[in-house]
Regions:
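A glycine-rich (often HGG/GG-containing) alpha/beta subdomain
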Residues: 1-140
């Protein structure tokens, strides 16, 4: 798990807020490249998210979670921005430019499992929650 990954942690489409997660050894470096600075661990602060030309993409919030006290067990940065797909794509593309790679579906949860943050039953429950299409399936997850 040497590579730092980035992906939206919120569902696709339009919405008021989107969460973009970065996880791995370079998460703080990439987060600083996108937001100029990070808050103290386990807190939020306002930020202007910028692209590789240092042009402002959006204004939002940034959170930092230091390993091992994060969802994945790695350093994690979460950027909370407006939920326009163009903004989300621009933030993710900029994170890739700064050194992350696009996460595969379920990869944040896979890392949490591999880093002993969750067990197999919990990982399967996360997948079931995300895939639930009925109230009954949601309760069963």
């Amino acid at each position: 798990m040497a590579e730092t990954i980035i992906a939206p942690a919120s569902p696709g489409g339009r919405g008021g807020v989107a969460v973009i997660r970065i996880s791995g050894k370079e998460a703080s470096h990439i987060g600083k490249s996108l937001c100029s600075s990070l808050p103290k661990p386990w807190s939020l602060k306002p930020c202007f998210v910028v692209n590789k030309q240092k042009e402002i993409i959006d204004q939002g919030l940034v959170a930092f979670f230091r390993a091992p006290k994060s969802y994945t067990g790695e350093d994690v940065v979460e950027i909370h921005c407006h939920g326009n797909p163009l903004i989300v794509d621009s933030v993710v593309s900029s994170g890739i430019f700064f050194g992350a790679r696009l996460a595969e579906p379920g990869e944040f949860t896979k890392r949490a499992f591999l880093n002993n943050k969750i067990d197999l039953a919990q990982a399967e429950s996360v997948a079931d929650l995300i895939a639930s299409e009925t109230s009954q399936a949601l309760r069963g997850a």
